[in-house]
Amino acid sequence: MGFFDFMQESIAIDLGTANTLIIHNDKVVVDEPSIVAKNVRTGEVIAIGKRAQQMHGKAHKDIETMRPLKDGVIADFQSSEQMIRGFIKMIPRKRSLFSPALKMVVCIPSGVTEVEKRAVVDSAEHAGAKDVWLIME
């Protein structure tokens, strides 16, 4: 264990078309539907996961719900990035003066293209990951 290990946290993410799981400290800390609700006019993501699923099918002209992952890969980069970032914020974390660097292991389906792999890595990095490793299902 190194001196600066307290400044790093490791998480595992299973990005699924239906649900996303995040494991932190050997526990499932996030188990949410992979769905986002967006404001149609601004494109702003207003809800993710269970809150977005509750909005699905409701008649409101300014809100649409969508699944940013198709067949286990990223179909909408910005929405998936915001969804991942929101799910990471749901992780119970220790209070600290500094935010620890995140190391992520992301599970992706086998057979994805290099472009799709790059989209997952970019999305995780934009969501705050310092290091990203991909594991094929």
Labelled PLM ranges:
Residues 1-137:
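Nucleotide/phosphate-binding catalytic cleft detector across ATP-hydrolyzing
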